[in-house]
Amino acid sequence: MAMLPQEIIRKKRDGDRLDPAEIAGFIAGVTDGSVSEGQAAAFAMAVWFSGMNRDECVALTLAMRDSGETLDWSDLARPIVDKHSTGGVGDNVSLMLAPIVAACGAAVPMISGRGLGHTGGTLDKLESIPGYDIQPSPELFRRVADEVGCAIIGQTADLAPADKRLYAIRDVTATVDSVPLITASILSKKLAAGLRSLVLDVKLGNGSFMTDPAETEVLARSLVEVANGAGVRTSALITDMNEPLADAAGNALEIENCLAYLRGEKAGTRLDQVVMALAAEMLVAAGIAAHEAEAEAMARRVLGSGEAMERFGLMVHRLGGPADFVDRPGAYLAKAPAILAVPAGRHGYLTSCKTRELGMAVIELGGGRIRPDDRIDHRVGLTGLRPLGTKVEKGEPIAFVHAADQSQAEAIAKRVVTLYAIADEEPARRPVIVSKLRAG
């Protein structure tokens, strides 16, 4: 006979180890409703206080994965690989990474999310493109992933439904920041998508959800160990998010930035370093390249030849967007009516910025949601964001605000200028790739 939910809660509350059958039974109850909201909340709090070892976390991840549909890509000839980012400001990496890796021979069926807090969402960015369907039929999703090599869509209700219920409960019970629960939440959705290898981009800094280096490494290590324990080859990069990654933040503006990158216009930037490092990890994990140097050379080749841009355009068209989108993006991406420069308040070097607040400025412009049902203004945001370490003269633009009207542009420009520190001495450059983690 299965153990009662309250006995499982008691066992974890007292710091004892749960076996896989107990965890699977409890998560089945979360899914079918036989475990009450109060019991699920108590379980989450017990895990928050007592933690879980790797085997427990693997069992929790697999139980949540198996709570709904799981995708099977075994009929595809291409190796299946995916990437997940913990989120930041100006982080449009998925938009370039998927077509680059696809052009190198992998399949990237990427299930992405919307904006969360101050961070932008890949789906919101793609919805800047007229006609792009983030919820295609399963058949179309599979066909595009196979024939184009990449397809970026939204999560369906059938993937990891236990996570959806448990996350909603964690959100209102102060248990969001539990490493085992974060790990299982992220990985259950990724594993349900049927991938065979995964690369994680775990952000660190004042523009990420994790600001403490030690805590960030604990989360990255947990994700890597649990995913590998669940049978998916996984590695992680910890990357710097103490400034926006791209030089744009906002939905249509980040699509424009993506196209500029795919045209080869962002070589050598922090964004380029992250894209290439993740592409190399993915290609090695997929077995397409033997080592990172070979993988990066492949990625650079398809970027330079235009093959990656071609894949992006094909993905957009096959998922409902314009056939000539990459050739004529200006004809399709809406433009904000008010654009205003943000002038530097003095001469000197940009030494730091409040990245999270830059993300919140985009939300205040209408580029993100305060309430779940808010409509997004895809036109608005920030461009021309100067990287830290740049020497500027007084009055020189350090960013441009794109707003729905002039008064809003002026208000946000006044705020943005206060978010940057300028000093006489050039700051030390932070490496954008902080560290790499692999299993073992």
UniProtKB/Swiss-Prot annotation:
GO terms for cellular component: cytosol. GO terms for molecular function: 1,4-alpha-oligoglucan phosphorylase activity; thymidine phosphorylase activity. Keywords: Glycosyltransferase, Transferase. It catalyses: thymidine + phosphate = 2-deoxy-alpha-D-ribose 1-phosphate + thymine. GO terms for biological process: pyrimidine nucleobase metabolic process; thymidine metabolic process. SMART domains: PYNP_C. Pathway: Pyrimidine metabolism; dTMP biosynthesis via salvage pathway; dTMP from thymine: step 1/2. The keyword Transport does not apply. Its EC number is 2.4.2.4. InterPro entries: Glycosyl_Trfase_fam3, Glycosyl_Trfase_fam3_N_dom, Glycosyl_Trfase_fam3_N_dom_sf, Nuc_phospho_transferase, PYNP-like_C_sf, PYNP_C, Pyrmidine_PPas_bac/euk, Pyrmidine_PPase_CS. SUPFAM superfamilies: Nucleoside phosphorylase/phosphoribosyltransferase catalytic domain, Nucleoside phosphorylase/phosphoribosyltransferase N-terminal domain, Pyrimidine nucleoside phosphorylase C-terminal domain. It is an enzyme of class 2 (transferase). The keyword Ion transport does not apply. HAMAP family: Thymid_phosp. Homodimer. Belongs to the thymidine/pyrimidine-nucleoside phosphorylase family. The enzymes which catalyze the reversible phosphorolysis of pyrimidine nucleosides are involved in the degradation of these compounds and in their utilization as carbon and energy sources, or in the rescue of pyrimidine bases for nucleotide synthesis. This is Thymidine phosphorylase. It comes from Rhizobium meliloti (strain 1021) (Ensifer meliloti). The lineage of its organism: Bacteria, Pseudomonadati, Pseudomonadota, Alphaproteobacteria, Hyphomicrobiales. The gene is deoA.
